[in-house]
Amino acid sequence: MNEKQKKTQKLRARLPRGFVDRSAADIRAVDEMIAKIREVYERYGFDPVETPLFEYTDALGKFLPDSDRPNEGVFSLTDDDDQWLSLRYDLTAPLARHVAENFNEIQLPYRTYRAGYVFRNEKPGPGRFRQFMQFDADTVGAAGVQADAEMCMMMADTMEALGIARGDYVIRVNNRKVLDGVLEAIGLGGVEQTNTRLTVLRAIDKLDKFGPEGVRLLLGEGRKDESGDFTKGAGLNEEQIGKILFFVGITDYARSADELAALVAGTARGAEGVNELNTIRGLVLSAGYEADRIKIDPSVVRGLEYYTGPVFEAELQFAVTNEKGEKVVFGSVGGGGRYDGLVSRFMGQPVPATGFSIGVSRLMTALKNLGKLGAEQVTAPVVVCVMDRDIESMGRYQRFVQDLRHAGIRAEMYQGNKKNFGDQLKYADRRGSPIAVIQGGDERASGVVQIKDLIEGKRLSGEIEDNVAWREARVAQVSVPEGELVAKVRQILAEQAEDRKRAG
């Protein structure tokens, strides 16, 4: 490559795979949603905390939820001391490190929330990103299931604060201990059965995807998919498979509770789990949360390898159209559970903890589908046009802008290079500006400004076909003294807002 080629070669602009640029509308929508979620968390007595994007990799370690890649899935680098650092995979492991490192200063139970980006070094795909936002709430140091019940109630209140109606969401609750009891009852207890239990957990995790019959195959000899690929099963017999499918198939806990209790009666862990579910059910019912809002549902299997007790999931139940044009239930927008082992691994002593995480990006999509987000349009700035470029004129334009800003009105002075007035109005139109402020030499000599209602002008433009007549009519344009600029702009903006309200 010669010197001339080097000089003319351009760097290719490209977005990394699995990442997205966020528009102003998306940023404002997320801010609106987070403010509503934060208000609920604060009402429950939770306080904010913030941890860094990077953690030492061993602080994340084998507790990464992606069980197939326990020591991968993260973006990592080494620092000057040859210590491995990784971008956080979730917000829970950093919280565990924070609690352990500051244990003597923290008041237990420690009730905290935080929002932030997390990063996954995984293959990206449709709806699967390498960077996304989560909003978590956790209670550390509370061993009783009342803390888990409170999490479920807070999730329900959060859904409603976001405008999701009852019937369009449900908080589903299960307990890892109950499943452990079921597995022990069918002969899958003990260290020697660890791998089989993991295979069973992964099989029932596919319940929503493959249905009961698909899970039956995965619990048995195995399943062949449409492409012909075969997944080896857990190798259970029909009796074992039947009891697992009974457990995950319970839809009415009140009617099936006795039968489930009998199934795990011989296992201490299973009986403890059933008792915890009954306690959670009693607490939420006493607080006025019926089963249409918080439901005991043994088919919830999220993170059962990760959690140690109750698990819960926030599911949206309305239908949406997927990329194949099919009507499907929107599904999960967040969840969590009890993770008593996560802080303890730093401490060498038991530290109970429970919490949940909301997938902000996914929930934002749901709220947009419901028309619950972004309804409050942000008014684009008023544009003060630049008719003359001498210092005195520019100073006046700048003063107009500052007067509007000090009155709480978004405003900008045209900063482009084009001197043509028509180009400035085109800029304002493309910007979505509601008003243009104009002052040429004649207006300046008279101490007045022209205020052009761009919204009304656009509406009326279709009613005047002749361009000459349009210019002469000065449609939607009014002249006012400089001192009345702010008041007139405010009046026009209020009228535009009223028009939008009537039209909406």
Swiss-Prot record:
<dbReference type="Pfam" id="PF03129">
    <property type="entry name" value="HGTP_anticodon"/>
</dbReference>
<comment type="subunit">
    <text>Homodimer.</text>
</comment>
<keyword id="KW-0030">Aminoacyl-tRNA synthetase</keyword>
<keyword id="KW-0963">Cytoplasm</keyword>
<protein>
    <recommendedName>
        <fullName>Histidine--tRNA ligase</fullName>
        <ecNumber>6.1.1.21</ecNumber>
    </recommendedName>
</protein>
<keyword id="KW-0067">ATP-binding</keyword>
<keyword id="KW-0436">Ligase</keyword>
<dbReference type="InterPro" id="IPR041715">
    <property type="entry name" value="HisRS-like_core"/>
</dbReference>
<keyword id="KW-0547">Nucleotide-binding</keyword>
<dbReference type="GO" id="GO:0004821">
    <property type="term" value="F:histidine-tRNA ligase activity"/>
</dbReference>
<keyword id="KW-0648">Protein biosynthesis</keyword>
<dbReference type="InterPro" id="IPR033656">
    <property type="entry name" value="HisRS_anticodon"/>
</dbReference>
<dbReference type="InterPro" id="IPR015807">
    <property type="entry name" value="His-tRNA-ligase"/>
</dbReference>
<comment type="similarity">
    <text>Belongs to the class-II aminoacyl-tRNA synthetase family.</text>
</comment>
<dbReference type="GO" id="GO:0006427">
    <property type="term" value="P:histidyl-tRNA aminoacylation"/>
</dbReference>
<dbReference type="InterPro" id="IPR036621">
    <property type="entry name" value="Anticodon-bd_dom_sf"/>
</dbReference>
<dbReference type="GO" id="GO:0005737">
    <property type="term" value="C:cytoplasm"/>
</dbReference>
<dbReference type="InterPro" id="IPR045864">
    <property type="entry name" value="aa-tRNA-synth_II/BPL/LPL"/>
</dbReference>
<dbReference type="Pfam" id="PF13393">
    <property type="entry name" value="tRNA-synt_His"/>
</dbReference>
<dbReference type="GO" id="GO:0005524">
    <property type="term" value="F:ATP binding"/>
</dbReference>
<dbReference type="InterPro" id="IPR004154">
    <property type="entry name" value="Anticodon-bd"/>
</dbReference>
<dbReference type="InterPro" id="IPR006195">
    <property type="entry name" value="aa-tRNA-synth_II"/>
</dbReference>
<dbReference type="InterPro" id="IPR004516">
    <property type="entry name" value="HisRS/HisZ"/>
</dbReference>
